[in-house]
Amino acid sequence: MAKVGQINASPSISIEFKTLATTAIQRSERGTVCLILKDKKATGKWYSFKTIADVEAKSWDAESMKYINLAMHYGAFKVLVRVVQNDEGMDKVLKDLEMRKFNWLAYPQAIETEDQTVVNWVKQQFGTAGPIGKTVKYVSSYANRSDHVAIVELGNGGTYKSIYGDFTAQEYTAAIAGLIAGMPLNRSADNH
C-alpha cells in the first residue's frame, strides 16, 4: 500500500481486472447455436429462432423439429438454422457460415465425410479474424483425436434418449451444442 506522497504503480489495473472478472460470467451467458439441417419442407436457407414459439412446426420436417427442439431445450440464446439446399455442396454451406456470428455449430444429419469436412473447416476458422473468427466450435460424434480446442468429440455411441425421442450420437450433437451454449462460465455441463 502506498503511503502519503508515494505513487502507487498499478491501482487502475487491479480495478480493471476485478471488473473484467466480475462481468466475465455475465458476458459468457447464453451463446448462439447454428444447426446445419437437410429439410425438404423449409423453403429458405437461413432461419433464426430465439424461442420455440418462433418456429412454425408445419414448415419443417418432423426430424428437423426434433433437432431444433434439442438445440433450444437447454437455453441457448438463439438458434440459427442453415438449410442445405438440394444440389448444394458443403463448401457453399460453409462459405455462408463465414458470414454469420455464432458460438456453437452442429450438423446432426451429417455422414462421416461431411462431418470431417466441417471439422477441417472449423479448425481453419478458429482464431481468425472475421464475423465468426475465434468463437466457432463444433460438436461431432465422428471426430476422433481431432486434438483441437474448437472440436468437441462426443465419444459415446449408441442411442441417446430424450423427451423428443431416441437419437444417434451424431443427431444428439444438436442437444450438446445447445447445452454448452446455454452454460455460463460458472456452470459445468457435466453436472446439468
Residue ranges and their predicted role:
Residues 1-192:
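Surface-exposed assembly/interface segments
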